[in-house]
């Protein structure tokens, strides 16, 4: 399956643009700031309903407009699927599948799958824990679209619970509020348990692929690992930082992976009770998946703060490759051909020659690879393919 046609209306800098694509490698070349990333961002948005560049939808709408439209035609063999996503200012986004009646935006999830490499990926290693939690949750949604509702439910309950805790901090907390908090504890425990259970399973699947990808990129100079730190095991301090380190999950975290959603729910209820006094004092929820950490490890040390610039890039690339391999595993297990689109957005300009060639050799065999670059010289010869020239406001030529 591959993306054959992309059409954008009032998305970012584009009033209207159409891009024809095919299987194999396509390289989009154009000067910086010309709009190449906008095209890749739109494709990624179809896959995850989120942007890798901004946290809200407002910047995605061309200035002065009230809505943007992304339309994509996907081809598998003799069959094609057209998906549309309407991004609206001030109201819910809507989707369409094969020009059907409008559906919820999240109903189009899982049709178009992407793995996007971008300069912003440095935040996966160097940034706050929220970047790594977002990486896990976006991958979860790509693999199992129903997890979009799982995360949405958790965020809704967390917002309500935090509002209640905040009212306590301002001196407005009553016995009635405490009973209400007990109810929200139950809701948040269940929603948190479902999200935690899914994340733990995903990390277990990612870990061997992460180490393998890092070895491919660096000739196995160090082992690469990932350790999930959960607040219900007390392995994080109150500010969200890890209190210990290691290349393998601690026994307590490993035990969590063996628990059912019901058992994790009970663990959360207990953790909320134990932390209630401190939460009431601070007016915020201190326990839950929203404060967990995915710690990335190189050798015996955490990658954040210890990895060199080159090692940091290798770890970022390895995380994306690991997600690609997990998606391939699912596609093959499901009895369908891989349906993944690999997007490398201005990545090669950030890498040394060795890493460029290693990465290019790994991804060159994918069914569809989209690459952006400011100049042809940034593209390794392993990714020689069709060239498209991007100019202000549109596409100039295709080769």
From Swiss-Prot:
Places the protein is found: Cytoplasm
PROSITE patterns in the cross-refs: RECF_1 (PS00617), RECF_2 (PS00618)
InterPro entries hit by this protein: AAA+_ATPase (IPR003593), DNA-binding_RecF (IPR001238), DNA-binding_RecF_CS (IPR018078), P-loop_NTPase (IPR027417), RecF/RecN/SMC_N (IPR003395), RecF_2 (IPR042174)
Record-linked SUPFAM superfamilies: P-loop containing nucleoside triphosphate hydrolases
Alphabetized UniProt keyword annotations: ATP-binding, Cytoplasm, DNA damage, DNA repair, DNA replication, DNA-binding, Nucleotide-binding, SOS response
GO molecular function list: ATP binding; ATP hydrolysis activity; single-stranded DNA binding
Cellular component, GO, one term: cytoplasm
GO biological process: DNA replication; DNA synthesis involved in DNA repair; double-strand break repair; SOS response
Pfam entry (one): SMC_N
Transmembrane segments: none
Binding-site positions, ATP: 30-37
Gene3D superfamilies named among the record's database cross-references: P-loop containing nucleotide triphosphate hydrolases, RecF/RecN/SMC, N-terminal domain
Function: The RecF protein is involved in DNA metabolism; it is required for DNA replication and normal SOS inducibility. RecF binds preferentially to single-stranded, linear DNA. It also seems to bind ATP.
Record-stated family: Belongs to the RecF family.
Full protein name: DNA replication and repair protein RecF
Species: Paenarthrobacter aurescens (strain TC1)
Gene name as annotated: recF
